[in-house]
Amino acid sequence: MCIPIHPNLDSTMINHPLFVRRERVPGNKKEVAVGSCATRLVKSLMWGSLLLVSAAAFADNAPLSTQIVDLANKVDGVHPGYRAFHAKGVLVEGTFKASPEAARLSSATLFNGGSIRVTARFSDGAGVPTVPDGTPAMPRGIAIKYHLPGGADTDMVTNSFKFFPVGTGEDFRDLLTAIVASPPTAPHPNKLEQFFGTHPNAPKAIGSLPIPDSFADEEYHGIDAFIFVNKSGQRQAVRYVVAPEKLVHITAEEAAKLPPDYLFDDIAKRIAQKPVVFHLKAVLADPSDQTKDASQPWPDDRKVVDLGVLTLTKVVPNSKEAEKKLLFLPTNLTAGIELSDDPLPTVRTAAYSVSFGRRSQPGSASSN
C-alpha cells in the first residue's frame, strides 16, 4: 500500500523516484525499491537522496555542487562509466539551420543561417542506467552541442519539465534534505510535506511530467532564462523550447506494457528510417517577467519565435563509449547569448563538473 506523501500528490507522484528509496538485498545484484510502493522495480530520482542521513553530514562546508553529487550517488548508487544525472542516454548527430528571425534576436554564430553540425543526447532523467523508460513522473531530456565554425562549441540543456521544482541550488539542497528526513515511517507532516507547503510549485512541477511515446514526440524546455544580444546591442530574455513535429503522450498503464528500453529502441528505428525533426524556439520574456526563478513559469501568452530547425540523422556508433567524453554544460555559451540572473545554470555546471571529475578517476563515481 502506498503511503500518502502530500495531499496534492496522486498515486503516480507517490510512485515517483523522489519518494522511493532503493536498497541492495544481500546476495542479490539488483537494487529493489523499499518504502512507499515497495513492490515497484528499480526507480531513480532526477536528483536527490532518500538515505537517512542528516543535514549535519554537510557540516564540513563542502561546496553546494559536491553536496548535490554526493546525494545523487548515494541514492542511486555509483555506476562507473555512467552519468550521475540522466545516466541512461544515447547520442545522435545532425544539423541545425537557423531562421532569419533568430539573427534579429541574437548575434550568436549558430543563428547566422548556415548549417551547423550538432551532437545531441536523449536521456531519461534518472541516475540509474537501467531505469525503465516508462517510469512515471520522470523527466526526459535532450542536450544539444552545436559545433560552431572555427572549432568552438556551445550547449543547450533541456528537459521535459515545463518549470523546475525549485529556483536555486540552495532550495534544491533543502528539498533533498527534506526527502532525506522523510522516510515512510516519519510522522506527518513530515519534512517533505512541510517543504512542499512552502514551495508549492515543487509538487506541481513533478506531477506535471508526462510520459512520451517517443523521444521524437516530446517537447523539451530550457527551464532557465538566458539573454539574447543582437548586433545592435538590444537585449531580450528568453527560455528555450525544443518542439517536436507532433506531441504524443501515453498513460502510465500503456507505458507499463512497453519494453523497459522502448524509447531508445524507438529513436534508433526512427532515425534509421528518416530524419527526426525538431523546431528550436524561444519564448520571449515581457519586461515585467522575472528571469531569476526557474520554478516560476512565464504566462502562456508570451510571444514564441521559431529560431530554426534541428534535423537529427544518425545515432552515434558505440554511443555509450562516445558519450563518456562529452559534457553538456548550461553555461557553455557563445557571444550573443548570455547568462541571466538565474542561478541554476551555474549550479548545474558546477555539479556536472564535479561528477565528471570523479568519473575520470578509475573506479570512482559517474558523471555528466
List the model feature ranges, each with a label.
Residues R21-R24, R40:
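Basic polycationic patches enriched in arginine
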